Amino acid sequence: MNQPERYELIELMGLPKVTYELDSKSPNAAVVTLEKEDHTLANMLANQLLSDERVLFAGYKVPHPLNHNFILRVQTVEDCSPKQVIVDAAKSLITHLEEIKVNFMREWELKMISVEGVEMEFS
């Protein structure tokens, strides 16, 4: 068949997951490349970074739709490193996603209880 093997979409095959480089064109800027990730994580991370007042610029690009990686560019104020801001944004995203998961599971369980209650009345 004329398609890549499915394991190639998630297996790194010797590539580092994250590559971090300081940007020589701008002060206090960095370029981060994440392998085997797509717009989902890139958009969440860029938006989380933009909500931080220490961040002057945050944006990403996906070089090619068939290559599953993205390049994130971050520029911060002088007294803060881009690496620390990215780590803080990732931790904040994890916390936020955990809250969403807890809320979803609670609502799902309430929905299941209400469905079971309806089924019991008609049985």
Swiss-Prot record:
Q: What is this protein called?
A: DNA-directed RNA polymerase II subunit RPB11
Q: What is its main location?
A: nucleus
Which InterPro entries does its entry note? RBP11, RBP11-like, RBP11-like_dimer, RNA_pol_Rpb11_13-16kDa_CS, Rpo11-like
Q: How does it assemble?
A: Component of the RNA polymerase II (Pol II) complex consisting of 12 subunits.
**Keyword Cell inner membrane among UniProt keywords:** no
Q: Which organism is it from?
A: Schizosaccharomyces pombe (strain 972 / ATCC 24843) (Fission yeast)
CC terms in the record's Gene Ontology section: cytosol; nucleus; RNA polymerase II, core complex; RNA polymerase II, holoenzyme
UniProt subcellular location? Nucleus
Write down the PANTHER family for this protein, in alphabetical order.
Answer: DNA-DIRECTED RNA POLYMERASE I,II,III, DNA-DIRECTED RNA POLYMERASE II SUBUNIT RPB11
Q: Which family does it belong to?
A: Belongs to the archaeal Rpo11/eukaryotic RPB11/RPC19 RNA polymerase subunit family.
Protein role:
DNA-dependent RNA polymerase catalyzes the transcription of DNA into RNA using the four ribonucleoside triphosphates as substrates. Component of RNA polymerase II which synthesizes mRNA precursors and many functional non-coding RNAs. Pol II is the central component of the basal RNA polymerase II transcription machinery. It is composed of mobile elements that move relative to each other. RPB11 is part of the core element with the central large cleft.
Pfam families documented for this protein: RNA_pol_L_2
The processes (GO biological process) annotated in the record are: transcription by RNA polymerase II; transcription initiation at RNA polymerase II promoter
| GO molecular function terms noted in the UniProt entry | DNA binding; DNA-directed RNA polymerase activity; protein dimerization activity
Q: Which domain of life is it from?
A: Eukaryota
Q: Which PROSITE patterns match?
A: RNA_POL_L_13KD
Keyword Transcription assigned: yes
Q: Which keywords label this protein?
A: DNA-directed RNA polymerase, Nucleus, Transcription
